[in-house]
């Protein structure tokens, strides 16, 4: 799929004070949401107003009966990035808790949100499958879903993330502290 151009009204916004965006990406059940749960209060402890945009929650509004087609995913992640951009523009720090299986999705967000960091949550697929409480991988293995990242659909891991976190060795609280240290050094 060809990368779309950025409309003028989505050009990067530069008047946003201290706000920034963090995209936490990784395979389903890799530990993204667990890290985000530990991260949000730590960021708030730094005096930041924080909003988490969790993909499953937002998807229920944007695509209530998802097909996970390429076109639908592109629309969804562009809408998610747009929402994040608007929040950052109004001084709200945004944490994206979303697989965003293609680099293109995350790169689009980076292009419209200047103060942006990408966190790669790394975990072997077998461990993700063992941790999977939502049944995502089971549906994929049983043929009920044909677009599970890591199974039928590729997951494009970040090439140069701002931080890599191995959730098989790093507890969520430690991961959140590492992210806060990075944010403090980079933005605060």
Task: Give the positions of each predicted feature.
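Extreme N-terminal, non-catalytic leader segments
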Residues: 1-21
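C-terminal accessory "lid"/substrate-recognition subdomains
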Residues: 2-3, 45, 177-188
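The conserved Walker
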Residues: 28
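Glycine-rich phosphate-binding loop used to anchor ATP phosphates in small-molecule kinases
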Residues: 71-117, 121, 138-139
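Hydrophobic anchor at the beta1->P-loop junction of P-loop NTPases
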Residues: 24
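Small-molecule kinase domains that catalyze NTP-dependent phosphoryl transfer to phosphate-bearing small molecules
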Residues: 122, 130-178, 187
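Conserved substrate/cofactor phosphate-moiety recognition/catalytic segment
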Residues: 37-85, 89
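Conserved lysine of the Walker
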Residues: 32
């Amino acid at each position: 799929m060809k990368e779309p151009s950025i409309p003028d009204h989505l050009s990067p916004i530069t008047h946003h004070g201290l706000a920034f965006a963090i995209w936490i990406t990784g395979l389903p059940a890799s530990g993204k949401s667990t890290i985000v749960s530990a991260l949000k209060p730590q960021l708030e402890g730094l005096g930041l107003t924080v909003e988490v945009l969790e993909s499953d929650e937002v998807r229920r509004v944007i695509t209530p009966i998802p097909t996970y087609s390429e076109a639908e995913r592109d629309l969804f992640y562009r809408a998610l990035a747009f929402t994040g951009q608007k929040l950052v523009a109004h001084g709200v720090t945004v944490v994206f808790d979303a697989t965003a299986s293609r680099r293109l999705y995350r790169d689009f967000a980076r292009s419209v949100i200047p103060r942006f960091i990408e966190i790669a949550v790394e975990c072997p697929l077998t461990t993700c499958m063992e941790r999977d409480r939502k049944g995502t991988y089971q549906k994929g293995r049983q043929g009920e879903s044909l677009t599970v990242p890591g199974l039928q659909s590729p997951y494009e891991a970040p090439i140069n993330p701002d931080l890599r976190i191995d959730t098989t060795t790093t507890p969520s609280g430690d991961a959140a502290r590492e992210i806060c240290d990075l944010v403090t050094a980079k933005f605060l």
